[in-house]
């Protein structure tokens, strides 16, 4: 078996957009971050951006359905491809240098698997914490969770919520007066629903807009620099966020820019 490292690396870099492509629910925000080219490198960069945003944002961000479908399909295909190549190498009496390319590819796959796992763990942690809030959101806006969660996350959320509510009822609530048995009471001095900390300060980087796509939200500040304007209700002021700049702002002030892919959290 003659292994050509150039052919192997070409397989890893080949654009496999068509693999595992599945329609995403309406409102999927994947294309807002990168809609120009669904290449392997672009998808990895977008995945890392989603990962960073999810780790910093106080709320659960929309699940990137289309992006994750492509990434997971490529990951499974490359793992299978690597196992096939490894089997062929082990059957040959070659020197150690022949195994080096396979070790490099395995390291790259482990790096990708780390990002995917970390992203999903972060999301599951928020689902656990904001279960009652998600329940309230689903009741207020039917269908909202279809965009916010993946199919697997939706199953996890429903089962986790059912188990938690059953535990609360059996251990505590059934022994209390009827007027105190609600787990989603918001009328008292302290709300029983744990919502995201909307006013938390976050660091953000203002992204440069695509050169071939005019942005109606983009303005020019007093120094002639392109910028986005945000309103700070507490101060009653409008602040210009220059493109390429790094700022610290309250999350609720820049949330819309984040959802539109104008800024990234750092």
Swiss-Prot record:
Role, per record: The GINS complex plays an essential role in the initiation of DNA replication. Has a role in chromosome segregation.
CDD domains: GINS_A_Sld5 (cd11711), GINS_B_Sld5 (cd21692)
UniProt feature coiled coil, ranges: none
Name of this chain's protein: DNA replication complex GINS protein SLD5
GO process terms (BP): chromosome segregation; DNA-templated DNA replication; double-strand break repair via break-induced replication
Statement: the UniProt record of this protein carries the keyword Nucleus: yes
Keywords: Chromosome partition, DNA replication, Nucleus
Family statement: Belongs to the GINS4/SLD5 family.
Quaternary context: Component of the GINS complex which is a heterotetramer of SLD5, PSF1, PSF2 and PSF3.
UniProt cross-references to Pfam families, sorted A to Z: Sld5 (PF05916), SLD5_C (PF16922)
Gene Ontology cellular component annotations, sorted alphabetically: CMG complex; GINS complex; nuclear replication fork
Subcellular location: Nucleus
């Amino acid at each position: 078996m003659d292994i050509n490292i150039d052919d192997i690396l070409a397989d890893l870099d080949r654009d496999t957009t068509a693999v595992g492509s599945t329609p995403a629910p309406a409102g999927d925000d994947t294309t807002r971050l990168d809609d120009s080219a669904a290449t392997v490198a672009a998808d990895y960069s977008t995945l890392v951006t989603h990962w960073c945003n999810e780790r910093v944002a106080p709320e659960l961000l929309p699940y990137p359905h289309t992006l994750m479908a492509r990434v997971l399909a490529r990951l499974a295909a490359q793992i299978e491809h690597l196992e096939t190549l490894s089997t062929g190498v082990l059957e040959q009496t070659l020197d150690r240098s022949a195994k080096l390319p396979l070790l490099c590819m395995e390291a790259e796959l482990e790096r990708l698997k780390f990002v995917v796992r970390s992203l999903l763990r972060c999301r599951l942690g928020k689902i656990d914490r904001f279960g009652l809030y998600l329940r309230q959101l689903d009741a207020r806006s039917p269908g909202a969770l279809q965009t916010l969660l993946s199919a697997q996350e939706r199953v996890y959320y429903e089962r986790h919520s059912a188990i938690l509510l059953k535990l609360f009822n059996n251990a505590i609530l059934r022994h209390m007066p009827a007027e105190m048995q609600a787990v989603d009471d918001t009328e008292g001095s302290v709300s029983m629903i744990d919502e995201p900390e909307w006013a938390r300060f976050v660091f953000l980087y203002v992204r440069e807009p695509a050169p071939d796509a005019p942005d109606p939200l983009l303005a020019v500040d007093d120094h002639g620099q392109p910028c986005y304007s945000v309103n700070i209700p507490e101060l009653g002021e409008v602040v210009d966020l220059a493109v390429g700049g790094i700022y610290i702002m309250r999350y609720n002030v820049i949330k819309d820019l984040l959802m539109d892919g104008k800024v990234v959290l750092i």
